[in-house]
Structures are given as structure tokens and as C-alpha cells.
Amino acid sequence: MILGIDASTYLDELAHGAKYFDGNVPIDPLDAFHANGVDCMRIRVWNDPRSPDGEPYLAGDCDMDHYIRLGKLAKAKGYRLLLDFHYSDFWADPGKQMIPKAWQGMDVDALCDAVYTYTKDCLTAARAADVAPDFVQVGNEITNGILWPVGKLTLEDGTRGNYDAFCRLLAAGCRACREVLPKAEIILHLEKSNDQAVYREFFTQMETHGMDYDIIGASYYPYWHGTPEELFANLDACRSFGMRIMVMELGYGFTDRPYRLDGGEKRLVIDADRSYVPGFTEKYPMTPAGQADFVRDFLTAARSHGVDGVFYWEPLWIPGEGICWASPAGQKYIGEEGKSTENEWANQCLFDYEGRKLPAFDAYTL
């Protein structure tokens, strides 16, 4: 089983002076992960993560130049690479798939050309820089489509449809990948990983439309995606499609206490107020020991179900001055203005708020 991490914000952490420790001893976290058997780095790519005036959207400034820099660092340490195309200028997920600024106003034909050309150019640049990815993710958490509204799968009346346009867009990215990097494995990544009906519908449509891909990818966060048993029942059912299966994003908290910065407490996505995640069944306490038990049990179950890979999402995204999930400009682009501009995911890391390695770090091993 492949064990990986998505550490897309790592260069941003280093630029802001982040330090990581085993006890009181400074460590290089990428070396430490690799020693535990982690050997694949997932790196997200946004088209143009800046406002028209040039203000960065932050959260790592993850454009293609960033991919090349982080990819070179990871490859030098023995990591394979996974390039995660969002096909957006900033965060793309089930609740938002914003068309890049440069592509707005295009119809489906023009968007297909844009996706193909952009994908081909990025992968050609990666190959020229000697950081060609071993895996390419064509879209991020695309359960509800990509490039909204043109490629949206959730319709205004609440039903699902529009697969013809969606599949044309997706196929353009897959075709570019096959042409530039024929040996790279193509991943289609969804969330809602406890919903067998959605996965059956989606991947049946991929068969119907002749989609060229290799791996079914799923996100799993127990706050939103049910129990591990529901996840693995769904992944087992997906074996009927004949593809490899990976968990592309995984996370669990080591605390529900907010961190303090500038003398004030900072908001977290998952904190002591569980009303935000009403369906969450807390089998594991959000403590260092509970997080370690979750990670250990999850990997044991993944192996027993024949999962081909697991990636922990942003295990190094510790809090610090200048570290945030979105600038005001980034929030404006995705329509989420007025929110905090801090790091709201810091309690899901495998290092604590001071950068000390947590017990779950050593549980995350082959």
C-alpha cells in the first residue's frame, strides 16, 4: 500500500519560519515521514491564485511554479509525486468549483480546449523540470462536477445530471495527461465516501462515457463522511469497476481547543462545538492518543480491504504568523468573504501547535 501526504503548504510554513520537533530535537519532517514509509507527495495546483490586482490568495500560493519547487524538494528526498489539478484559481471542493478568471465566459467547447491546453502545458513543464508526477488527479473532490456551472452535476431542482458536458471536460484533462505522461496513473477523486449510490452512479457514468482513468480516489473525514465501516463498504463495492482504489485525503483532530496567536484564540473548522457536524459519531476522542488510535485503526482496515494508497491531508500545516487558509482576496474569489484569515485546520495536523511530533505521526507508517 502506498502511504502519502499532501503537504502543499510546506514551503509556506518554511518561509514563515516554522520548526518541527521530535520532543525538543529539531527534525526535518519530510525525512521523518520517509523513514516511516511515506513515499508519495500530493501537491495541489491552482491556475492563478491571485486577484486581478496581484494580491495572493495564500494557503500556499499553489500555482505550477510552486509545484515545481516543492516537487524538486520532495523528489530529492525520495518521494514520488502526485499532481492534484483543481482547475480553479483557488479551493475546489464539493461546495465550489469556480471557473478560473481567465476562462470565465467560455462555453463547453472552449473550456474543453482550455482544460486540454492547460493540463498539457503544466505536465510538459513538470517533465522538463524533472518533476513529472507519477500520479495525476484530474479535478479535486469532483462529486458535484467541475468548472461550474458548465460542468456542474447537481442541478437547480436538486437532481443530478449534465454528465455529457462534465465528461467532455474531464476527458480533455485525461487526454492531455496520456499524451504527455503515458505512464502516469490518472485519478478521479470524489468525497461523500459513505454514499454508495453516488459512487455507483458516478463511476457507471464514467464507464458509459468511456473515461480513461486508473484510480478511484475518495476523501475520508469522519466529521462528514460517516463511519470507517461505511467508507470501506463503499470502496469494496467500487471494486466492480476494475480500478485501483485510494484514499486521497484523510484527517482527524488531536484536540478541539483553539490555538492562540496575537493574544487571541483562533477559530477552527472542527472545535468543541459539534453543531457544525451534526452527523459526526465521535468514536475516537479528539486527543493525541485518540488521533493516534484513529490513524492506526484506519491503516489496519485499509490494508485488510486492499486499499492501494492512503494520503494524510496537510499534516504539517501548523499555526503561525502569516499562515492562513485564505486572504481577503481569496475569500472574495470563492464567495466566502468575511471569514477568519487564520489557519482553521491546525488541529488536524500530525504535529501540535508548537510543532512537536504527535503520537499519530508514528502510527502513520507501513
Regions found by a protein language model. Give the residues of each.
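Aromatic-rich peripheral "rim/lid" segments of glycoside hydrolase catalytic domains that contact
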Residues: 154-156, 233, 237, 255-272, ...
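Hydrophobic faces of well-ordered beta-strands that scaffold small-molecule active sites
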Residues: 3-7, 39-43, 81-85, 134-138, ...
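Soluble or luminal CAZymes and related metallo-dependent hydrolases
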Residues: 24-25, 62-66, 110-118, 162-169, ...
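Acidic-and-aromatic substrate-binding clefts and catalytic sites of carbohydrate-active enzymes
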Residues: 13-24, 48-65, 143-146, 191-200, ...
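Short aromatic-enriched loop/helix-cap "lid" or pocket-rim segments at secondary-structure transitions
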Residues: 16-18, 93-96, 148-151, 199-201, ...
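Boundary/entry segment of secreted carbohydrate-active catalytic domains
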Residues: 1-32
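Substrate-binding cleft and catalytic face of glycoside hydrolase catalytic domains
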Residues: 32-185, 191
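Glycoside hydrolase catalytic-domain groove-lining segments
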Residues: 27-34, 164, 175, 179-185, ...
